Amino acid sequence: MPSSSERQRALAEFVVRLRRGLADSLVDVRLFGSEARGEASPESDIDVLIVVQPDDARIALEDRIIDIAFDVNVEFGVYISPRVVTPGILNHPVWGATPFLSNVRRESLPL
């Protein structure tokens, strides 16, 4: 099982690869869940919210993000769990107000 420092290195590498691979499409990257709250165990997944643009490219960008997460997961022995949204989803009166996104807004940390 990866140590806390290995998990942090994996997360940092994931963010570097996102920035390199998505460039101008990447709007924001935020850590949430047990890792952000300081409650993670070595078996916990690492929840990451990734905001991309444009809205109509989300599916294609999500595929790339999943590939990046997979590579980092295999290399570091962690489980990064990406959740991909767009500004349109975040600002939508219904989708943006879901309990999930409300919790992410409240507890997330910028990466």
Regions found by a protein language model. Name each.
Residues 34:
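Basic/aromatic recognition patch in beta-strand/loop cores that engages polyanionic ligands
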Residues 47-51:
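Short beta-strand->loop micro-motif that forms the acidic, two-metal-ion catalytic signature
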Residues 1-28, 37-42, 53-111:
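Catalytic core of pol beta-like nucleotidyltransferases
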